[in-house]
């Protein structure tokens, strides 16, 4: 939130959160599931606009919710190799959303400093993907460690009008971290390593 030509002061948001989950753990396996329902009053959500210095702006929406399930699982394949997975399926909605778009002069695109109300109805909250999934494969042996991480994020809308043209496409990225730890006289341990981000150059 920041001041702009339309002087609007934000309200404090209120959240009622219900969650229920279960976890399991053994020497080789871990697993868990968690269900949640988050009911908001006057939630502050991004609206796709930028303020005078380029920061994302937010607005209050009177009635909204986030609900979903979080899943996690892990397996110790060997003493030196482990694989962990987690993912969140969610539904993030605004009820009876009314948004406002700025009006511009058709020929010059000069800002007219007026707005038009757009009744969207029920819509997806901006920057709220319906699925996020992560994978971590970790290797540790005789001082050498490697970690290969991957993440998938589903489509994210830049504002609350749910237009595909104003959205980020789903993406899948992977990173690789390598490290080696060794000892020297009078030194407890030295670790050298490197990380390659977006190793497959996904765009």
What are these regions (language model features)?
Residues 28-31, 80-83, 143-147, 184-190:
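Repeated loop/turn-to-beta-strand initiation elements of outer-membrane beta-barrel proteins
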Residues 3-9, 17, 54-60, 68, ...:
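Extracellular loop and loop/strand-boundary signature of outer-membrane beta-barrel proteins
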Residues 14, 27, 65, 129, ...:
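Residue-level preference for beta-strand/loop junctions
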Residues 9-60, 65-67:
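Membrane-embedded beta-barrel scaffold of Gram-negative outer-membrane proteins
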Residues 6, 16-20, 67-71, 131-135, ...:
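Hydrophobic, lipid-facing positions within transmembrane beta-strands of outer-membrane proteins
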Residues 37-40, 59-160:
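Gram-negative outer-membrane beta-barrel transporters
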Residues 41, 93, 151-159, 180-203:
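C-terminal beta-signal and adjacent terminal beta-strands/loops
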């Amino acid at each position: 939130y920041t001041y702009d030509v339309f002087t609007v002061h934000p309200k404090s948001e209120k959240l009622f959160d219900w969650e229920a989950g279960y976890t399991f753990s053994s020497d080789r396996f871990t697993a868990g599931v968690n269900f949640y329902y988050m009911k908001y009053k006057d939630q502050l959500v991004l609206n796709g606009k930028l303020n005078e210095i380029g920061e994302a702006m937010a607005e209050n929406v009177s009635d909204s919710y986030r609900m979903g399930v979080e899943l996690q699982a892990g397996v110790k394949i060997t003493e030196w190799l482990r694989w962990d997975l987690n993912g969140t399926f969610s539904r993030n909605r605004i009820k009876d959303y009314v948004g406002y778009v700025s009006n511009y002069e058709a020929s010059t695109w000069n800002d007219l400093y007026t707005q038009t109300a757009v009744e969207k109805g029920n819509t997806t909250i901006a920057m709220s993907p319906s699925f996020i999934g992560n994978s971590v494969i970790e290797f540790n042996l005789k001082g050498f460690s490697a970690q290969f991480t991957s993440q998938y994020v589903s489509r994210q809308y830049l504002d609350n009008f749910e237009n595909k043209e104003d959205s980020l496409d789903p993406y899948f990225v992977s990173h690789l971290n390598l490290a080696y730890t060794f000892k020297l006289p009078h030194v407890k341990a030295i670790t050298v390593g490197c990380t390659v981000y977006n190793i497959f150059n996904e765009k």
